């Protein structure tokens, strides 16, 4: 299961996606890459931050990899990506993401 991993994003839990997006855009100059009712992906400088609804997604760190399916069953998302969530031995959630070719953020 050797894979080349690259940092993809850190996910922060927020109660109101719209309000959080507005704050990150106005305060930090974030660029919105994707947004729906349960999460948003923002680019702040060279870092991506996911803002996630507490009842929909866990707080986590994500890595992009070519074959996330080797770590478990892929879940397919509305933004075109697919991922697997795993936990380290200490209960921290890690997401392994496969992004479609040509994804901007």
Question: Can you say where each PLM-predicted feature lies in the sequence?
Answer:
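N-terminal beta-strand motif that seeds the catalytic metal site of vicinal oxygen chelate
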Residues: 1-21, 48, 59-61, 103-105
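Short secondary-structure boundary/capping segments
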Residues: 2, 32, 40-41, 53, ...
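Short, isolated positions in well-ordered beta-strands
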Residues: 48-50, 94
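Short glycine/proline-centered loop/turn elements that form peptide/ligand docking sites
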Residues: 19, 37-40
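Conserved acetyl-CoA-binding loop of GNAT-fold acetyltransferases
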Residues: 26-33
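Vicinal oxygen chelate
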Residues: 17, 55-105
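Short strand-coil-strand connectors
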Residues: 43-45
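Conserved active-site tyrosine of GNAT-family acetyltransferases
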Residues: 20-25, 91
